[in-house]
A protein has these predicted regions:
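Short, charged, intrinsically disordered terminal tails
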Residues: 1-5
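Compact, glycine-rich, soluble single-domain proteins
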Residues: 7-93
Length: 93
């Protein structure tokens, strides 16, 4: 992990959904959208349903993120989500 990345782990009840080094991420909280870069001020937030955006050196990823909370530290973010899905996993029926 370099100074330009942070370690992110997204955990759902049934699996570790995502784990990797990211340059930026964004998601909804109960107070609005939060964008997080490496060395963000430490905080804990409550997640509101919406889109999770993850920027890696290889490109961007998006997922549907539902209720949960996030612990944001200077070099890492841990999300505990009630539910989270990649676009191809969403059952629209």
């Amino acid at each position: 992990m370099s100074d330009n990345t942070m370690r992110v782990k997204v955990i759902a009840p049934d699996r570790v959904f995502y784990e990797g080094d990211v340059t930026f991420m964004e998601f909804n909280t109960i107070e609005g959208i939060i964008g997080i870069y490496p060395r963000h001020i430490p905080t804990t937030v409550v997640i509101a349903p919406g889109v999770l955006k993850i920027s890696e050196s290889q490109g961007d990823k998006t997922a549907a993120l539902h209720s949960g909370f996030a612990e944001i530290l200077g070099d890492s973010v841990t999300i505990l989500a009630e539910s989270v899905e990649w676009p191809d996993e969403i059952d629209i029926r």
